Amino acid sequence: MKKERAGNVSAKRSPKLSTTATLRAHARHKIEKGAVTEGYTADRTKVVKMLNDALATEIVCMLRYKRHYFMATGVHAEAVAAEFLEHANQEVEHADAIAKRIVQLGGEPDFSPDTLVKRSHAEYVPGKSLMDMVKEDLIAERIAIDSYKEMITAIGDDDSTTRRMIEWILAVEEEHADDLAGLLDAGH
């Protein structure tokens, strides 16, 4: 009796795999949808909106980092400015990945300057001193970290490609926060 139950449990865990013919037929059906197949279960409209807000966040963060890169002055400014530039370039990579995913989902990436700050989770705060700049960037990274964690939870298993992309971005944002916290601790 126990063997029978064990067999049933493992059978329940194993998803039924489609035949090659079925996979091929599904791929040909609604081909105009591109990467979005019948197995996609997320609400695309909501995911695209979340991604456009994340896109705005990445662009605003890039702009702030670029300003801080050019405005950094003081004894340790060169090393801190290099960190700002590295982060700015990584934010551009994130924005590009997000925009590409939006298009894959059949949406349009919103690069409108008129609404960037309004849609961004993080604020654009210029900062006056080098220490202010580091603090503002750290605050923005902490906001991004929380918003990406919420997005990952909201998406769940409904869109694994988008979730993995956001998890990758989240890992980089956490590195940014660690870098900036280290600069604060060092008193730059």
Language-model regions: role of each:
Residues 1-188:
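Iron-associated oxidoreductase/ferritin-like identity signal
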